[in-house]
Each structure stands twice: as C-alpha cells, then as structure tokens.
C-alpha cells in the first residue's frame, strides 16, 4: 500500500480521571502514540505516507520532524485552528474536542510550526453539534470560522500568500493525489467569519 494512512494519536492507557478534559487526556498520550505509529511504520518499511492528524503537542511534532529528517518513512502532520489559536485556559463545554486543548507552550509551538512550514497543512476538524449536545459534554466543534480566523492570524504574522496556499490547499491535495484547481484564499474574511459564526446556534470562538 502506497497511499495515506491518517491516524488519530492518543494512547488511552495514559488517560486519567481528572475532571478537566484537557488533563484527562494528557499530552503524553499523544506523544507516546505518535512515537508508536512512527516505529510501526518504520519497522514495517511502510511505503505510503503516515499522516498524524490534528497534532496538538510540541513533543509529538518534534518526533514527526525527527522522522522526516531521518527519512526512513514519509510522514506528514496537520493542525487544527483551535489547537493553534486556543490553549487549555479557554477550555469549556463548548471548546471541548479530541485531542483536547493543550497548554500555552504547546499552542504557541503549533502556531509557530504552521508559520515555519513544519506542519504540512491545516485541518478544520469540522465536527458541529447542537448546543444541547455540547452542554451534555459532546466533543467536537464547527471548524469553518476557526479556519478563517487562523488564516487571518497567519497572515497577520507574515505568512506569504504562496505558503498559505500550500497549507490550506495544495499540500493536502498532493498528498492524497487529488487534482484540484483551488479557489483563491479570501482576503477579506470578516463577512465570511460572521456568516460562519451564525450558521450554528452557538459560536465557540466567541465564547
């Protein structure tokens, strides 16, 4: 098999009974899982691409960067808007997802790694729920507005339009062998952000 294997990396044996969602699924659960995935792919001499979806920790991303440098397997990673923009201090029932929000060091590292190109692409992780479901503890948030907010933030921090095009469009398309002619990324996003925020009965990015 020479295609893409995308993995959600959290090792459940490291989960705890903490009342905090972020602390109950600690960073180490992701780091150990990513380590194992890289080792499995390397030992199997995997010829495809191992993709680490919605990476959220500095430790896990460091392992991905080391594997890329070593060059024995092809490995990519993606990051979500919420893991790049919010830390666990913002955690509430509306900002609850898996993997959970991490501490500020992890968040800042994810954001800077998007800027540097060390993360291959942005993933919306779009998983909307009703307000009632969120108040019952369901995991997942709508990702459209967050994607626009992240686009703005990366632009404001000096990312070129060419590199934005890569991480929002072409890198993922190339990895999955999709031949597309992507639409230009929006420059004026404020109206779109308002529309996206109003599509749901609550806006987790405004809470």
PLM regions and their residue ranges:
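Histidine/acidic residue-rich metal-binding segments in metalloenzymes
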Residues: 1-122
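C-terminal cap of metal-dependent C-N hydrolases
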Residues: 139, 146, 182-207
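His/Asp/Glu-enriched, well-ordered alpha-helical/loop segment
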Residues: 21, 25-47, 113-185
């Amino acid at each position: 098999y020479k295609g893409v294997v995308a993995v959600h990396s959290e090792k459940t044996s490291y989960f705890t009974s903490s009342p905090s969602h972020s602390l109950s699924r600690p960073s180490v659960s992701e780091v150990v899982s990513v380590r194992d995935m890289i080792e499995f792919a390397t030992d199997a001499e995997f010829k495809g691409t191992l993709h680490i979806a919605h990476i959220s920790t500095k430790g896990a991303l460091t392992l991905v960067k080391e594997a890329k440098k070593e060059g024995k397997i092809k490995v990519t990673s993606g990051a979500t808007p919420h893991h790049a923009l919010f830390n666990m201090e913002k955690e509430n029932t509306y900002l609850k997802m898996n993997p959970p929000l991490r501490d500020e060091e992890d968040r800042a590292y994810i954001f800077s790694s998007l800027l540097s190109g060390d993360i291959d692409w942005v993933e919306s992780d779009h998983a909307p729920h009703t307000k009632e479901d969120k108040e019952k503890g369901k995991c997942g948030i709508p990702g459209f507005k967050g994607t626009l907010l992240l686009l703005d933030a990366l632009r404001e921090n000096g990312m070129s339009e060419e590199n934005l095009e890569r991480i929002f469009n072409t890198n993922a398309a190339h990895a999955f062998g999709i031949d597309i002619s992507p639409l230009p990324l929006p420059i004026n996003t404020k109206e779109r952000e308002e529309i996206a925020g109003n599509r749901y009965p609550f806006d987790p990015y405004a809470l």
